[in-house]
Amino acid sequence: MDTIVTPSDHRAEGEAVSTASPRDYFDLMKPRVMTLVVFTAFAGLIAAPVDADPFLAFMSILCLAVGAGAAGALNMAYDADIDATMQRTRKRPIPRGVVSVSNAYGFGVVASILSVLLMALASNYLAAGLLAFSIFFYAVIYTMILKRSTPQNIVIGGAAGAFPPMIGWVAATGEISLDAVILFMIIFLWTPPHSWALALYKSGDYAAANVPMMPVAKGAKSTRLQILLYSIVLVIFAGAPVLTGLGGAVYGATSLGGGALFLLLAWRIFRSRAGEAGSAEEGALYAVRAGDKAARDLFAYSIGYLTVLFAALIVEHAFGAYVAIPGVSP
């Protein structure tokens, strides 16, 4: 049985940690997550109905990237015990012993403050306020409160990851509009099926770390059903930009085709035995492995789905490819 490493253990070890490289601090910012954050924020900024100053737009996106990275660093600092326990996260900078918990906290706090202040100077106070709130929501509300206490952690905490396109929109326009809320809601609804697909085939990892993800707390069968239900709502809601005129024919086709495949993969999970690795039934091993593959497929595809969906908005608004859909677009 693995030994659980507590935050205090890492805090004590942190004093002896050698000087980390810039790459270690970059890894602390969760660069893969940060990339998707920046991309969706850029889509929100580009889709906004104004011509933003290129330099100020660049600075706004940079501030959002730093803010997202700062939130990631604070998350890793607080979750040092969990990361040391889970196979998926053991190679992160803190579990590897190259960055101390105290240094990660310091880095996260300083980067958070700088990103918010620069956003206020480069863009507007509303965008800066939303950035500050999203950092707080992820680092405190989700990481410190929800993640370890409720299987709804991802549902509620997903709001933090849904803010980037809204912040990009507000950075350009200075106001929150219906379209900005729609972009927020698309990511908010996307987060549960995306995260629970991962949690299904990594349920043993989460159970070992005592993280009450949905498969651990409510079981694999309930999780598979909820993935399907959230996927249906997501795919339907993803068509909303067409109804408001934000998305045109390119976006509509992307949403329709991408959504159909999303639902197919979600249905495969629902009909599978994903997340039942502990099943003792005879002959269950093959079915469970096939189910876990279905969960892996949806997890991987969901990232591409969201990327292509927002890329369609960029193509329409940045490259003049917007074509209204007769009888649908206003």
Swiss-Prot record:
Its EC number is 2.5.1.141. Its main location: membrane. GO terms for biological process: heme O biosynthetic process. PROSITE patterns: UBIA. Carbon 2 of the heme B porphyrin ring is defined according to the Fischer nomenclature. This is Protoheme IX farnesyltransferase. GO terms for molecular function: protoheme IX farnesyltransferase activity. Interacts with CtaA. Converts heme B (protoheme IX) to heme O by substitution of the vinyl group on carbon 2 of heme B porphyrin ring with a hydroxyethyl farnesyl side group. It is found in: Cell inner membrane. It comes from Maricaulis maris (strain MCS10) (Caulobacter maris). The lineage of its organism: Bacteria, Pseudomonadati, Pseudomonadota, Alphaproteobacteria, Maricaulales. It is an enzyme of class 2 (transferase). The chain crosses the membrane at residues 33-53, 54-74, 101-121, 126-146, 154-174, 180-200, 227-247, 250-270, 308-328. It is a multi-pass membrane protein. The keyword Transferase applies. GO terms for cellular component: plasma membrane. HAMAP family: CyoE_CtaB. Belongs to the UbiA prenyltransferase family. Protoheme IX farnesyltransferase subfamily. Pathway: Porphyrin-containing compound metabolism; heme O biosynthesis; heme O from protoheme: step 1/1. Gene3D superfamilies: UbiA prenyltransferase. Keywords: Cell inner membrane, Cell membrane, Heme biosynthesis, Membrane, Transferase, Transmembrane, Transmembrane helix. It comes from the Bacteria. It catalyses: heme b + (2E,6E)-farnesyl diphosphate + H2O = Fe(II)-heme o + diphosphate.
